[in-house]
Amino acid sequence: MLLQEFWNGRFWPYCTRNLRESTRVGYESAWRLHVMPCFGGMGMDAISVELVDKWLANFDTAGAARKAWAVLRAILRRAIRWNLLDVDITRRDIQLPAKPHYEPQILTIRQQRALLQGFYGHPLEAWLICAVSCGLRTEEGYGLEWSDIDLRSGVLHVERGLQWVSGHEVTVPPKTELSRRTLPLP
């Protein structure tokens, strides 16, 4: 079976039923821009470690290569799971480009205080206090609602996230089950 046939007939319909919209948007983009042009017309059993290594070596950025490989790997693993492919090249030693070192910028305590003081009395003050002080992911901070704050108990309930996907807002459950949590208010 050609990879493109599997994508159109089996894998993409599975994705539309089981994955978050933001994940689907990323998968579709990686498929259209990177995976399909190289492997779409190939039989799934013809895709080899050597071909994948050569393909990955031609990417301009490590991030794009890693995302495209993640999508190709997901496709091939689903085909194996559904008994449509016998050889699992995804478990072999695929050579991914080195990830550039990422050092997040973290506000110092002094910078946090200055930021919070600048928002004193602002309608977003409570939101900013929670987001800064509780270490929320960006989408978790965007998803906060007043009902998530329990002033009597002094806790904040992280119940959802808010993402901007394909030009519209999407409310999503927390990224992982451990992300659904209750935090002490500052």
Locate predicted features.
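Basic, Lys/Arg- and aromatic-enriched nucleic-acid-binding interface segment
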Residues: A62-A70, R81-L144, R152, Q163-W164, ...
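Short, polar loop/linker segments at the starts of domains and inter-domain junctions
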Residues: N18-V25, I106, S166-K175
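C-terminal catalytic core of Y-nucleophile DNA break-rejoin enzymes
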Residues: R152-H157, T171-P186
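Short aromatic/basic micro-patch
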Residues: A46, I106, T182-P184
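N-terminal core-binding DNA-recognition domain of tyrosine site-specific recombinases/integrases
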Residues: L3-Q4, N8, W12-L84, H101
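Active-site/catalytic core of tyrosine-dependent DNA strand-transfer enzymes
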Residues: S29, I109-R110, S153, E159-G167, ...
